[in-house]
Amino acid sequence: MAPRLRRNVSMLDPQHRAHAAAADPTPGAGGGVAVRVRGLRRVFGEQVVLDGLDLTITPGEFVALLGRSGSGKSTLIRILGGFDDGVEGEVLAARRRSVVFQEARLLPWKRVLPNVTLGLAGRDVAERGRVALAEVGLAGRERSWPATLSGGEAQRVALARALVREPDLLMLDEPFGALDALTRIRMHALLQHLCRRHQPAVLFVTHDVDEAILLADRVVVLTEGRFSLDVPVAVASPRRRADPAFDRLRATLLAELGVDDLAAATH
């Protein structure tokens, strides 16, 4: 079933509203979209942060978003999440959507389970929360306080909080950026498992080219407010850094980002 799309008409300036209201939320024969952006523009003062973006993400597709700091990646996430409505253009996003940020953003005065189920209603909410925590490897930690969690555990709670809502669109804004290397590897495996199980469309923001290739079906590069590259990840699974196809794609992405292999290796 195609995900229900939210028409973010309130985000659009008057010249685009009629077009958005008439838009078909499920274009294509028998298919659908989790995200459809056309001509998206975001300006802060005199600074153009996003300049005419077009982006489509299909149900179940995992898209990694790369770009230098300040290129507009987090701004795009905020817009798709409904946190920023000062935009021009057409923005359609799945109604059921969740966001995970680099910081877990847990409420310190609530225990783990209430953090996971925050804002949900229904008699089965607590059980759904426990199931979500078990899925991320935190069964039995329902009554723990956020302050007692490691960085990796806190991000697991954030993932549980996102997935308990069964989103059609899961957005992750550098969720593993503050974690150590070993914890990141474990979180990669967990995310892959959860995505196979729940099958949301994913928009994954990262600075790590290897991480993007390891996880994504497709990689897009944002450069000065525009998409400068959009490529499929044509690397056989299980993906290995030693695979020549992995190395070629890495070189392509690093070149697009203006970083050579030597600089990346010594970073």
Curated annotation (Swiss-Prot):
Bilayer topology annotation: Peripheral membrane protein
Subcellular location: Cell membrane
Primary location recorded for the protein, binned into one broad class: membrane
Gene Ontology molecular functions: ATP binding; ATP hydrolysis activity
GO cellular component, one term: plasma membrane
Keyword check for Zinc: no
Keywords: ATP-binding, Cell membrane, Membrane, Nucleotide-binding, Translocase, Transport
InterPro entries: AAA+_ATPase, ABC_transporter-like_ATP-bd, ABC_transporter-like_CS, ABC_transporter_ATP-bind, P-loop_NTPase
Domain annotation ABC transporter: ranges: 35-249
Lineage top rank: taxon: Bacteria
Residue numbers binding ATP: G67, R68, S69, G70, S71, G72, K73, S74
Record's subunit section: The complex is composed of two ATP-binding proteins (SsuB), two transmembrane proteins (SsuC) and a solute-binding protein (SsuA).
Protein family membership: Belongs to the ABC transporter superfamily. Aliphatic sulfonates importer (TC 3.A.1.17.2) family.
Entry protein name: Aliphatic sulfonates import ATP-binding protein SsuB 1
Lineage: Bacteria, Bacillati, Actinomycetota, Actinomycetes, Frankiales
